[in-house]
Regions:
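Extreme N-terminal "head/tail" segments of very large remodeling/mechanoenzyme assemblies
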Residues: 1-131, 135, 141-143
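Conserved beta-strand/loop subsegment of P-loop NTPase cores
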Residues: 147-148
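Short, small/polar-rich loop/turn modules that mediate ligand/substrate recognition or access, typified
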Residues: 151
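Nucleotide phosphate-binding site architecture
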Residues: 156
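Cytochrome P450
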Residues: 159-163
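Catalytic phosphate/metal-binding cores of nucleic-acid and nucleotide-processing enzymes, i.e., regions
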Residues: 169
Length: 170
């Protein structure tokens, strides 16, 4: 999988739309580095949320991903485009959140997902998008987390993993 573009709107610390164009880099291998609090994990959370509807941590839940700084009108979503086996995929997910509706009552914005391959919509069903992504990537969310990033303090988990577990990942 080669990342192409990542768009985050009202996601994590970002109140409005933030876009990262990975295609402008010459390499298909990336190192995302920076000081603590710089937003590295947010990038991986956005990728993981787009692909699997889950974050990279067992601590953060999808419902907590909407930015506290976003206006009520700003839609919360993540869109991730990537190349896989020569085909361009684009997956988009909305972040579930609560808001005050026109009647002044608390409502919940349900999560949504859509998947396009080569510009053609393949699915707009959460379950179908999840199944297709997992099937095509050959990874579930846990395996994705282990191969895409090593979270702070979790390096030893990878080093100490049993050979069988490592073989499943790689």
């Amino acid at each position: 999988m080669t990342p192409l573009r990542l768009s985050m709107s009202a996601f994590g610390p970002y109140a409005s739309l933030v876009e990262i164009d990975f295609s402008r880099f010459d390499s298909s291998l990336f190192l995302i580095a920076g000081p603590t609090g710089a937003g590295k994990t947010t990038i991986f959370d956005a990728m993981s949320f787009a692909l699997f509807g889950e974050t990279t941590s067992d601590v953060r839940e999808a419902g907590s991903l909407r930015s506290d700084f976003a206006t009520e009108e700003t839609k919360s979503f993540v869109e991730f485009s990537f190349l896989l086996r020569g085909k361009e995929y684009r997956v988009r997910r909305s972040v579930p959140y609560e808001y005050v509706n026109r009647n002044g009552k608390l409502s919940r914005k349900a999560p949504e997902a859509s998947l396009e391959i080569e510009g053609k919509t393949v699915s707009s069903s959460l379950t179908e998008v999840n199944d297709k992504i997992q099937k095509d990537l050959g990874l579930d969310s846990s395996q994705f987390r282990m191969t895409m990033m090593i979270a702070q303090g979790r390096f030893m988990d990878l080093v100490q993993a049993k050979t069988k577990d490592r073989l499943e990942i790689f």
